[in-house]
């Protein structure tokens, strides 16, 4: 039966996978290198979302009829899949769904207990989702804001005193050069031992460094479904203790079990603290399918996803590093291959590449403070790889870049 956004059946055996396992719908003459912004969606994820809209499109967590109960089961499965992917215990953590990573971070930072923290700690290298939300937190609460430097290996440079009664918000993987943040376990345990709270931005790490996250026990992890092969969605996996401590100012249906003229009673389930109103049920269900697809990639395709991505990243790095008139900022093997183009504007170069079917990101990637104020760099070009990319994509990119850069 042919059904779904792309009207193509999902592959079922390794023999049918080809080079673009899960992405057979993609045109051969187009190469997408912007997975750091949002990944493309494998066919099973599209099928799962379409199946919801076509066969049981109902509200969840508030109805008794069959379609709604099926939604309940699928959403519960997605919550469990989030915690399982991160290696978090459902006895201590709960998964809430929201708009995106930025929204999830702001929901937390705007509702944390007043007077709880002495300072907020982050780094100079953060995405605006962290950099601006921590800035606003400090301005609103009047606490000190500490901006940490990173070493050449990405390690955070801090004193133990910085962590005392601190709200620490940092990324697990940088979105400019793909560097994973080392020493997160020590940062988390050190902060928590000194009465602080740690929130991780895992938007990049979920798809490109999940092994780096597993085993960590922060107070909250925020990420986006659309960066890990799911639909557009935000996720907050937080301790029940943190969620129950929030001073809620964003309220609505789905959070309460009783309401009177001047009071309300909250549901006992901690995940509801961040879920005011109806949720994007189809997107949540698609996230569950995406996490299952990632988890089952090796068995279904015969390849290890991380190894495959690293090999392609090395091919791309090696092809670009040999070219003149560009300065690479990322390390070999990183899923992000970012460079400063010399003698040509980054946006113009991205336009030229697009005409040849090569789609890349140009600009500052929401890291304006670090790249502009601190490093005084011009706009950059970023290739970011995903599960859909192939050696043919890399060859097309390098073959297109070569005459452009040599002709400058």
Regions found by a protein language model. Give the residues of each.
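Pyridoxal 5′-phosphate
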Residues: 1-408
């Amino acid at each position: 039966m042919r059904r779904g956004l792309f009207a193509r059946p999902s592959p079922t055996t390794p023999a049918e996978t080809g080079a673009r396992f899960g992405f057979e719908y993609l045109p051969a003459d187009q190469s997408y290198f912007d997975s750091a912004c949002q990944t493309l969606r494998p066919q099973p994820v599209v099928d799962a979302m379409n199946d919801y809209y076509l066969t049981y499109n109902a509200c969840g967590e508030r109805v008794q009829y069959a379609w709604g109960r099926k939604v309940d089961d699928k959403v519960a499965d997605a919550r469990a899949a989030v915690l399982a992917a991160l290696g978090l215990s459902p006895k201590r953590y709960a998964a809430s769904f929201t708009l995106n990573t930025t929204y999830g971070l702001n929901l937390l930072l705007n509702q944390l207990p007043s007077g709880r923290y002495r300072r907020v700690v982050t780094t100079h290298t953060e995405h605006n989702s962290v950099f601006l939300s921590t800035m606003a937190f400090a301005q609103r609460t009047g606490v000190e804001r500490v901006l940490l430097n990173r070493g050449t290996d990405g390690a955070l440079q801090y004193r133990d005193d910085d962590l005392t009664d601190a709200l620490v918000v940092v990324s697990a993987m940088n979105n400019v050069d793909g560097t994973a943040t080392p020493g997160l376990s020590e940062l988390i345990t050190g902060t928590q031992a000194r009465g602080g709270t740690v929130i991780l931005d895992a938007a990049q790490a979920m798809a490109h460094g999940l092994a780096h996250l597993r085993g960590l026990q922060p107070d909250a992890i925020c990420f986006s479904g659309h960066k890990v092969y799911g639909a557009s969605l935000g996720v907050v996996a937080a301790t029940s203790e943190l969620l129950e401590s929030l001073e809620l100012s964003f309220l609505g249906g789905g959070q309460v079990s009783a309401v009177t003229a001047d009071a309300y009673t909250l549901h006992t389930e901690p995940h509801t603290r961040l879920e005011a109103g109806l949720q994007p049920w189809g997107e949540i269900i698609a996230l569950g399918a995406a996490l299952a697809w990632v988890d089952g990639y090796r068995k279904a395709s015969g390849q290890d996803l991380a190894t495959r991505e690293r090999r392609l990243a090395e091919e791309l790095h090696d092809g670009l590093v040999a070219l003149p008139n560009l300065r690479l900022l990322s390390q070999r093997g990183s899923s992000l291959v970012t460079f400063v183009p010399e003698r040509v504007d980054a946006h113009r170069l991205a336009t030229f590449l697009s005409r040849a079917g090569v789609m890349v990101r140009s600009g500052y990637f929401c890291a304006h403070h670090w790249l502009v104020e601190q490093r005084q760099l011009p706009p950059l070009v970023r290739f970011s790889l995903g599960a859909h990319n192939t050696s043919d994509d890399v060859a097309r990119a390098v073959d297109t870049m070569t005459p452009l850069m040599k002709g400058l």
